[in-house]
């Protein structure tokens, strides 16, 4: 059974505190937009789809609380301004993740249109917001399962031409249930392969410096009893070079895909794409359409978040033998005191290194001109 990282029911929101994983599984309450902002900024929740969902739901919880307390204005214009201000605030928690900005824009548009509707009130606006927020959670899970099915089919069709019924896959960072409403994007593809008895082995990278692969992806893989092996980031080249490894594909997620296919994802993704190209391994990006930013022409325009030097120079975990005791978490220094640190959270993989982008509407490959064209994905009249 897949993990449930986000629990939302009866206008109550809880998330797994991912800072404590894999040692302690604890759900923490999110009671306001401010709580949501801090959870995202502090990486208690991460993964582009999950960030957007938690942000939107955190405001839903706050609006519900205001309404229950009898403090909600009857004016839809006044409530609308409050919601829009909170949405803008939430976007500042993680500027690289396009899903968050995209969700905020959509909800802002919904709010603006609702306030112009005849008979609109503060109460009706909040009701509309809550309904859309809940649908967002449902749709993300459905989209992820479609991504998984499309991606698994694409990989297996190509593996079959080489006589392979089962495949080995490499993934980076965490793109599973912990990064989404459930099931996952890139890890959803791997999960679909496993469910179809077509996964021989998945390799997951440690994903320095924040160790999302070692802490989170490995946690999910062990939880679901998938055949899995953890490697450090620097071992990927050696893995691909081993004839017996037979890695069919590298599948990663995305925080933002530019209009030309350039993809911002966790630092280290670009290096894996270069390795894949050299070794003739398919390199795939798995992401919902909300991650595709058609307003950003290329990766050159993507803002890359830089994080604290301490994430590189220190590491946090429990003392060996005391796993499970949250009070025994220790921070250990790894690097020489005084060394300068550069710590970008993401890098941009050029579209030229990406073989395909897997979405909930299907797999997009480059056209005859050698470029990605995503417009058809957004044509609601076209079939999936």
From Swiss-Prot:
Major localisation: cytoplasm
GO BP, one annotated term: L-methionine salvage from methylthioadenosine
Pfam families: IF-2B
Record-annotated site: Transition state stabilizer: 173
Major enzyme class: isomerase
Localization annotation: Cytoplasm; Nucleus
Xref: InterPro entries: IF-2B-related, IF-M1Pi, IF_2B-like_C, Initiation_fac_2B_a/b/d, M1Pi_N, NagB/RpiA_transferase-like
Keyword 4Fe-4S (UniProt): no
Alphabetical list of SUPFAM superfamilies matching this protein: NagB/RpiA/CoA transferase-like
Catalytic residue list: 255
Pathway: Amino-acid biosynthesis; L-methionine biosynthesis via salvage pathway; L-methionine from S-methyl-5-thio-alpha-D-ribose 1-phosphate: step 1/6
MF terms (GO), sorted A to Z: S-methyl-5-thioribose-1-phosphate isomerase activity
GO cellular component: cytoplasm; nucleus
EC number: 5.3.1.23
UniProt KW keywords: Amino-acid biosynthesis, Cytoplasm, Isomerase, Methionine biosynthesis, Nucleus
Catalytic activity: 5-(methylsulfanyl)-alpha-D-ribose 1-phosphate = 5-(methylsulfanyl)-D-ribulose 1-phosphate
Function: Catalyzes the interconversion of methylthioribose-1-phosphate (MTR-1-P) into methylthioribulose-1-phosphate (MTRu-1-P).
Protein family per UniProt: Belongs to the eIF-2B alpha/beta/delta subunits family. MtnA subfamily.
Database matches in NCBIfam families: eIF-2B_rel (TIGR00524), PRK05720.1 (NF004326), salvage_mtnA (TIGR00512)
Name of the molecule in the record: Methylthioribose-1-phosphate isomerase
UniProt lineage: Eukaryota, Fungi, Dikarya, Ascomycota, Pezizomycotina
């Amino acid at each position: 059974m897949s993990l449930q990282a986000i629990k939302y029911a009866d206008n109550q929101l809880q998330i797994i505190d991912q800072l404590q994983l894999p040692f302690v599984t604890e759900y923490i309450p999110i009671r306001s937009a401010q709580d949501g902002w801090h959870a995202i900024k502090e990486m208690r929740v991460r993964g582009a789809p999950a960030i957007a969902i938690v942000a939107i739901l955190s405001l839903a919880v706050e609006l519900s609380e205001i309404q229950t307390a009898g403090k909600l204005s009857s004016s839809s214009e006044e409530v609308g301004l409050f919601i829009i201000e909170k949405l803008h605030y939430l976007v500042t928690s993680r500027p690289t993740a396009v899903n968050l900005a995209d969700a905020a824009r959509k909800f802002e548009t919904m709010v603006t249109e609702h306030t112009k509707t005849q008979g609109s009130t503060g109460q009706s606006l909040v009701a509309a917001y809550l309904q859309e927020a809940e649908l967002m959670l449902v749709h993300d899970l459905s989209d992820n399962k479609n991504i998984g099915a499309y991606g698994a089919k694409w990989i297996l069709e190509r593996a079959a031409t080489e006589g392979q019924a089962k495949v080995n896959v490499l993934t980076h960072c965490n793109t599973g249930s912990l990064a989404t409403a459930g099931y996952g994007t890139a890890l959803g593809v791997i999960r679909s392969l496993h469910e179809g008895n077509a996964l021989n082995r998945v390799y997951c990278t440690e994903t320095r410096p924040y160790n999302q692969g070692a802490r989170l992806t490995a946690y999910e893989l062990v939880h679901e009893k998938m055949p899995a092996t953890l490697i450090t980031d620097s071992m990927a080249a050696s893995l691909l070079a081993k004839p017996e490894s037979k890695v069919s594909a590298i599948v990663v997620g995305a925080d933002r895909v530019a209009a030309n296919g350039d993809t911002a994802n966790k630092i280290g993704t670009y290096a894996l794409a270069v390795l894949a190209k050299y070794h003739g391994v398919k390199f795939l990006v798995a992401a919902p359409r909300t991650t595709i930013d058609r307003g950003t022409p290329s990766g050159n325009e993507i803002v890359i978040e830089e994080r604290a030097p301490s994430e590189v120079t220190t590491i946090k975990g429990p003392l060996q033998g005391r796993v499970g005791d949250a009070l025994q978490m220790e921070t250990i220094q790894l690097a020489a005191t005084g060394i300068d640190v550069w710590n970008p959270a993401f890098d941009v993989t050029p579209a030229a290194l990406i073989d395909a982008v897997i979405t909930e509407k299907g797999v997009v490959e480059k056209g005859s001109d050698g470029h990605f064209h995503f417009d058809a994905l957004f044509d609601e009249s076209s079939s999936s």
